[in-house]
Amino acid sequence: MTAGDVVERIRKNVGVPWREATYRDTFKAGGPATPVTGIATTAFASFDVIRRAVAEGLNMIVPHEVTFWNDRDDVAVVKGDPLYTQKIDFLTRNNVVVFRMHDHMHDQRPDFLYIGSARELGLDAKHETAPGSHRFTIPETTLGRLAADVKKRVGARALRVAGDPNARVSRIQLGVGYATPSVNDAAVDVVISGEQQEVDGGFDNPEYVLDAAALGIPKGWIMLGHAVSEEAGMLEMAQWIRGFVTEVPVRLVKAGEPFWAPK
């Protein structure tokens, strides 16, 4: 089985028209003729992920995010960087092929990234107010207890929370990656999201939450981090690929959280 065979099966099973002009969902290292010994899905193909995948005998990596630190994986802008030289040399020496899956994952309905994140957070479908809304109603709790539960579930080292920890909340809006739901929605108490700007947003920044807390209005924001919010979706991706690629092992190799907080 070659990497091209795997990609062809992905295209056949993805369930949405393939974006032929995509610059994201393409080969980033190696190519379609590369023989595949195993497949690793991951949030992003860091050097550590690549090294662990190779150690596990998985030479095809399917990351959701970039490999060479820019959205287009444009090697022209990094060619003189010593990290690029070492990374591409390691990929080449170990016959590793990298094929990104980003746009078509988000095009799918339901979106694997949301399925995985909701599952990891314990937000069952029975709690979702409407299919595909990513809005959930849970038994009332405090923002502090909810944040502690989220931290435990995702294993985050650097979880960030805005809002009064004693605020009573039950209505959650989920966003993954760069998705930034508006926290001013009257039907939302807490936004749980991935990556978030801190200023200049449109009702999607922590200042609104701080003002709500000062006025005694229950609002909260829990920021997981981009990779943390989407990694569970790459487990869903691995399970999906296993459904039509049975010749080689397919599993998640976690990129993990890039940030940490000093104690």
Go through the PLM ranges and name each one:
Residues 1-263:
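Hydrophobic structural segments
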